[in-house]
Amino acid sequence: MTVTKLSERSGRCMAAYAVALGVLYLMVGSIEFATAFWNWFIELGGGLSLLGLPGDDLFGGFAALVIGLVFLGAIPLWKGSYESIGFILIGSLLSATLAAVYLLIVGADGLTAWLAHLSGEEWSWEWLTAGTLGTGIFRPEIWLAFLSTPLVYIALKSTRTGRQA
């Protein structure tokens, strides 16, 4: 992978956007991880939940922390170290993967609600906002993945594949 000529302004904008995403992921991940740790190990079965985030997803919080740290790896891009674009690409890939998993869970909840409706239960849209995930489609990792799409577009546009001689 070679990097085409990238202006200093573009590099700084990409770095600032990546840092903003990284900080958001770190905030969401640390809250989810801390509340899940509290509910799992300190106050067993406790219902602690901060800012409406799920309080029982320890591994989702850890994944969000990792994604935030990967996005923060793009900080050297501010000084023109264009090799840091890889952190943006990997962070966006991890972000999209986590969002896809959560969207599949929401879809499975919808399928469950539909099958229950077919068997005679009353239809409810609750699966969309309060399903297995606790927050359903309002899960912050889903929306943060959508926020990372402009960044990955610019990063992919500024890179191209080339053959090594």
What is the meaning of each model-derived region?
Residues 1-165:
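Topology signature of small-to-medium multi-pass alpha-helical membrane proteins
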